[in-house]
Amino acid sequence: MSSRDNDTSQSDHVPLDLTIEILSRLPAKSVGRFRSVSKLWSANTTSQNFINSFATGSLASRPSVLLTVRKGDILFVFSYPVDKNSSDGQFTCVGSYQLTNPNFGNLSRYHFLKWTQYRTKSYTSKMRNSIREVETVGDEVRLSDKYMYTMNVYPNHIESLVSL
């Protein structure tokens, strides 16, 4: 084989890092199907690094709101995707956690069903992939007659930052 043929065959291949970047932008269902293309693609799409970067990338591309509510020394953290086409004014919680002592970073699962935007007004920054506190009406939200909870809202958060 001449060196010219060798140069041509090398230029016909897409670099692996570019292939992985393209795969990371596809829907999860498509990535699952592409595992059967070759052993190399299967190994790359099932590696822990790819799975972590895929999850972070897909969460970063979806607009979402991170809501924290503090009751005494307990911090509740809720994650809500923001659907721009939704007209019902409700967020559906996709992830929620309870931190009993934020200094130690202990995280346990906690469930919270819905939060309507009519209970509080929040104004989200259009900046993506950053955690920024946004303005709310008041610093506290009354969820029952007896308890007051301090609330903070963060737009466009990356879920993996919560689970550190």
From Swiss-Prot:
CDD domains: F-box_AtFBW1-like (cd22157). Residues 9-56 form the F-box domain. Transmembrane segments: none annotated. It holds the Pfam family F-box. This is Putative F-box protein At1g59675. It comes from Arabidopsis thaliana. The lineage of its organism: Eukaryota, Viridiplantae, Streptophyta, Embryophyta, Tracheophyta.
